[in-house]
């Protein structure tokens, strides 16, 4: 006896009388379905033969047989089950069923749609009820699993007219990213595609209408991936191999980039023009007028004064170990510049110098921020970051590739330094909280007129060993490349082989500039900044265990300088030499900028590390005080603002293209550097020359309009004469012409010293005349002429005459150098032949001159 099915209503569904059946009712429904399936098999009549071009594969789960009959065997898979079967399952089993039916998509650490136990079971009960209700023959209702997904995502319950129930293939991406394919799940026949937004024809949880993107414009803009595509991929990507130390048998993944050819409307003409010859005295006069305190600056003995004077410093939790200090290795000397531009000598990492640098760079962390709810606010800042800068569609369709290839490239780069696959440490056995510390020997040139009252302090570097960095750097490099591909068109990160400061089709003239100078950027970062980075890394697709691990050993660390014997604990501040320094500084700067300013008001945004520059048509509106009150940064809005970033000015030519020009003031200072090592063949000087030429490759593009822009920007930034900047360009043109012109800027007194002190590397032979021998015999002293081992007597004896000869077979100089030395010796008229006493250097006078470096004059 067939019992009538309960009427479908929301009340019956909620009180349990509809959709939740008793075991007897379940058995009845199953038997009815078996009878209907068997009757369909008995009553089937084949249709007339029709010639079709392609066979159509039918799904075994479908009861509709438009082109063929189903199998005689009726599977139990056809029988639907009620919601009571799922009420008895655990949460894990329900989540597996949720993945099977709804088929959510994982974007970063988010499931779209999110899993809700109550909603999922209600959707199952609703689908069970809808299948029992007689439906209209006009449209075909979806099968059970797809119907559950449709109810859960609140989409259509019926198949489209043009789509069959067993073959629903819809492109889930609204715009293809060249070189990428996106498969969110391994689909079976009869699956329901994700819901599509009717307004923008995109996936519902990827469209701008959804809260994940929030802005329609963010998905409509071009990104980095639109201009650069992956040319080829070889091998298989495995993100876990980076931390598994698998060694050289890993298959590298090569990822090359190729830029789309852009149509050129006009070809810029060649602007190689003859310039006036520049005298070196003119360049020195420019330095004297532009940098008045630099012309007489000489720090040759400044560090000696620091080491020998009284020293007082106030630091907390510092450990000093002065027993096993590493002695400084003496170098072979440096080239001496002709120009005096205020450049300093190299700094030696002594204990006092390191303590002074730590005091300024690492200690005395400012406490400028207010008390805030760190978890809630850090999550809000990270969400604002993704809304302001990230194209959500590109992030969902981009792949995380090239990790293993970056790992092999890193190992190949440092192979000459002794780094090999066998020497890689086990990261789980290493204490990653310990960092090495050192100071930079090269001090950054100072452009302010304060050298007469202030001594520059060197920067510090906090770093891990190469064995540890080699395992983290490839991961962050690949993640940074993915981050670049997902940025909106207006955002530029000038780093790497592709992205640079050159912008075609963008003119910096008639634009408002916004430049934020963040002081004490590294040591001002705290727990708030670390939590922001953790949320952003998880959102970009970094594995959550690695992100958590990386942030844990950045909460508290210990730095130690072995050469100086100094150690100190630090907390959340930025490590200036690890694998995440540039990437971390960039995302922190971008997050702070997006929270203080509305990024939609800017046409271009540049974020290289801790620098930032924005261009807008209208005056920028924002609240820069939040840099201090919220993010604990000492921020200063540069006024007047000029297009200046990374020590470069941005200029636009007549064709509307923007290119970068190094700061002329800093380039002139580099011409007077005292850090070029001496070499006999000038190889180090030539390397500096090639670097100088590469930095000044813009000279061929400098028209009169560009020179006028540079002069104006130079005056606004430094409040100095812009005409001197034009004169500096003439000097650059001369010294980039050839290497011989560049050599005029440096000299070395090493060769002149070698002409005089020729006993440093050869044996000294003393021959005495018969007059001296007869005189010695009178004094009762007998010496043999051929005795080469004895040291000559006191050179200050009255009336002595010695003849010094250097054996030709042991001399390394040429005949020309020998004649020059002899002529130099003969030209000196000295009444008494003397040998410079070794007592002047604090050495016993009985030591031979060749051992103590004394100078013999005849």
UniProtKB/Swiss-Prot annotation:
RNA-dependent RNA polymerase which replicates the viral genome composed of 3 RNA segments, RNA1, RNA2 and RNA3. The keyword Chaperone does not apply. Interacts with replication protein 1a. Keywords: Nucleotide-binding, Nucleotidyltransferase, RNA-directed RNA polymerase, Transferase, Viral RNA replication. GO terms for biological process: DNA-templated transcription; positive stranded viral RNA replication. Residues 809-818 have a biased composition (Polar residues). This is RNA-directed RNA polymerase 2a. Its EC number is 2.7.7.48. Residues 798-808 have a biased composition (Basic and acidic residues). Transmembrane segments: none annotated. GO terms for molecular function: nucleotide binding; RNA binding; RNA-directed RNA polymerase activity. It catalyses: RNA(n) + a ribonucleoside 5'-triphosphate = RNA(n+1) + diphosphate. Belongs to the ssRNA positive-strand viruses RNA-directed RNA polymerase family. It comes from Cucumber mosaic virus (strain Ixora). Residues 511-624 form the RdRp catalytic domain. It is an enzyme of class 2 (transferase). Residues 775-830 are annotated as: Disordered.
